[in-house]
Amino acid sequence: MILKKRSKSSKNWLKRNFNDPYIKERNKKKLRSRSWFKLKEIDESEKIFKKGMNVIDLGSNPGGWSEYTLKKIGKSGKIFACDILPMRFLKDIVFFCGDISNSDFLKKIFLFLDKYSWNVVMSDISPNICGYSVIDNSNMFKLSNIVLKISRHVLSNNGYLIIKLFQGYGFNKYMKKIRNIFELVKIYKPNASRVNSREVFIIAYGCKK
């Protein structure tokens, strides 16, 4: 049997992940995802999560952000998680599987969300990446606009939005839009984000009603 040689890119991927301290720590702590550390950094910087908060986690699979948040808000809080892909069961979390860009599914989740007051909307959503930045960003901002629509609909006046974005095409336009909706807006790049990644996280506070 002749084994195919791994491509240079796959070798680089293996090397990068083998040497990644966050992946090592994730495995040690048995966490659901590497992105757990990104949210932890954001929270330690901004002091967002408190006991009893109600939180919406969009693009939740595999559950790293929900896992972190659950410990911060305690049993008196509530988490609604949503993803286009199924997510492994996580106790005390309400999970809906579906596509937020589908209008019928969006109506379905609003029926649930409207029953409660929400303190935080967080989104780690990312589109399928093709590698062409203009297309990737365009698809990203289509999803991000839906996240913004959900946030405006459900957030309390002193609520937070945490959302991942890609820098580059369309970024400044989206930032202008988000600054028109929230009182305070910050751009944050966690240490856990890879150096060559275009991702940044926006922390917005005080939704204008």
From Swiss-Prot:
Gene Ontology, cellular component aspect: cytoplasm
Name of protein: Ribosomal RNA large subunit methyltransferase E
Native species: Buchnera aphidicola subsp. Cinara cedri (strain Cc)
Domain of life, source organism: Bacteria
Keywords attached to this entry: Cytoplasm, Methyltransferase, rRNA processing, S-adenosyl-L-methionine, Transferase
Secretion signal, residue range per the UniProt entry: none
Annotated S-adenosyl-L-methionine binding sites: G63, W65, D83, D99, D124
EC numbers, comma separated: 2.1.1.166
Active site (catalytic residues): K164 (proton acceptor)
Similarity section: Belongs to the class I-like SAM-binding methyltransferase superfamily. RNA methyltransferase RlmE family.
Xref: SUPFAM superfamilies: S-adenosyl-L-methionine-dependent methyltransferases
A Pfam family this chain is assigned to: FtsJ
Catalytic activity reported: uridine(2552) in 23S rRNA + S-adenosyl-L-methionine = 2'-O-methyluridine(2552) in 23S rRNA + S-adenosyl-L-homocysteine + H(+)
Functional summary from the UniProt entry: Specifically methylates the uridine in position 2552 of 23S rRNA at the 2'-O position of the ribose in the fully assembled 50S ribosomal subunit.
Subcellular localization: Cytoplasm
A molecular function (GO) term: rRNA (uridine-2'-O-)-methyltransferase activity
